[in-house]
Amino acid sequence: MNRKISRGGKIIIYLVLLFVAFVMVVPFAWMILTAFKTQSESTQMNPFLIFPTAFRTEAFVQAWEELNFGRLYLNTFAMIFIRIITCVVTSDMAGYAFSRLKFKGSKFAFGLVLFQMMVPEQIFVIPQYLMLSKIHALNTIFSLCFPGLVSAFGVFLMRQAYMNMPRDLEDAARLDGCNIGQTFLFVMSPLTKSSKVALCIFTALFGYKELLWPMIANTDNNMTTLA
């Protein structure tokens, strides 16, 4: 049975929510307002100096020109775009293979995929760096994309998506004369669009916030990312 909350209880709940919202919003608002201050204003220890004396945009112009933000944005978006394409394509095919095709060593191979998900990504930094150094691919867009061209998480996600789909769809396609490739391309793969969208979002987020690898693989400031 639902219990009604008294008016006093609602007021307390609203006050707590307002306090939590205040704590979450104030640092973000402070950061934005500080960007419009002069250097002397931003370094003052006066907690009551919240708003700048005048809203100035010189800091934005200086940061854009000195740090070459245009090039950094281009590198970041190119890396994310390439990673999304390769991750979705490879994860889609591998996920379908692991969920539907019965081949020798499939369980062992999928176990390796799960094992890779449990290993910290920092362990792969040195081997990946040495591989790119051998082929002289450092300080390139390819070096930014390299660790995320395939995704163990993406393979696991797409496998689970195909595991939840009925086999009757494949049986019907087979009766219509479709082979395995046609069944995958024209019947099964279009039905996993929601999982692909989720994979695209995760891939973009992981790539955008990646900090360690771009610093190691690309020493040229014009070939790094926003992170």
PLM features: residue spans?
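A structural signal for multi-pass alpha-helical bundles of membrane permease subunits
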Residues: N2-A227
